[in-house]
UniProtKB/Swiss-Prot annotation:
Marked site positions, Important for catalytic activity: 174
GO BP annotations listed: carbohydrate metabolic process; cell division; cell wall organization; peptidoglycan biosynthetic process; peptidoglycan turnover; regulation of cell shape
Species assigned in the record: Psychromonas ingrahamii (strain DSM 17664 / CCUG 51855 / 37)
Name of this chain's protein: Beta-hexosaminidase
Summary of the function given for this chain in its UniProt record: Plays a role in peptidoglycan recycling by cleaving the terminal beta-1,4-linked N-acetylglucosamine (GlcNAc) from peptide-linked peptidoglycan fragments, giving rise to free GlcNAc, anhydro-N-acetylmuramic acid and anhydro-N-acetylmuramic acid-linked peptides.
Location of this chain's protein in the cell: Cytoplasm
Gene name tied to this protein: nagZ
Amino acid sequence: MRPVILDVEGYELDSEEKEILAHPLVAGIILFTRNYYDIEQLKALVKDIRRYAGNELLIAVDHEGGRVQRFRDDFTRLPSAGSLIEKNDMKTACELAFSSAWVMASELIACDIDFSFAPVLDLNGISNVIQNRAFSSSITETVTLAEAYINGMKSAGMVSTGKHFPGHGSVEADSHTALPVDSRSELEIFTKDIKPFENLIKKGALDAVMPSHVVYSQCDLQPAGFSSYWLDDVLRTRLGFKGVVISDDLSMHGASFVGNHLSRAESAIQAGCDLILACNDRSGAVSILDNLKVKPTAQYHAVNQLRSTKNKFILPLNKNPIWIKNKQMLMQLSEQF
């Protein structure tokens, strides 16, 4: 089992990164804005990552749209999830969700990037870090728009990752800088926040799920990403999820209360994560690679599935009529946001 997804520092690989990529625990790389200058540079970086890894590995990015879009120049400007329904009826919003996801996925795949960590399934509530990254505060609207978005991703050949299970929208604190605590009752969480995940799992729409670094104090005292209650009892057993569980970044402040990076990695895997993100802290990531002991799990085949649906486009995107049509729709929408 190769469970660790890491980051790289810049536009090109340094000597340490070339060595790290060949480590037997490395499953993938997540890219950030700092890794992008232009499309040709990005393609060269991805090619080098794959070459030095030796084994096939995942390359991912957060490319939701709106304020969370890592690559901008020469990529289509993508709308935030929340903007889709603000000025449109549901039929139009679903068409835009599909188009946005298809364009996002096709442009990333054209650069040999496997997937974006999307969509956000949190309900829009009091969370400043979520806000319009969420489709809506309505369960029905969230499920409908998310399903259209996922269909767009899959039509282009990309898998989906629903986040942040079981819901990050009802806490004010940002788990990047604090440990949010959601003190609502189990009943409220299960009748509201968890519903988009539950419904999309029933539909077989989700390939992967990313849990939050939030404590739901009336349910369990561990953050969800380190909680066997949330990942095993609820997600796997109660909701019947068969896909891949990917931790949020273990370097986030919301994960620091579990211990050092090795303890975080061990706890996340023990709780039920199949893949773990260790970003923006090289020494912490190296300590995981040097010391983590893992065993193969039943999810190893599912982890491989994250890259099995990737397509390569025969036509260049600027000559692909589907891309041209969808891009034009998004350009019209961009005038509204």
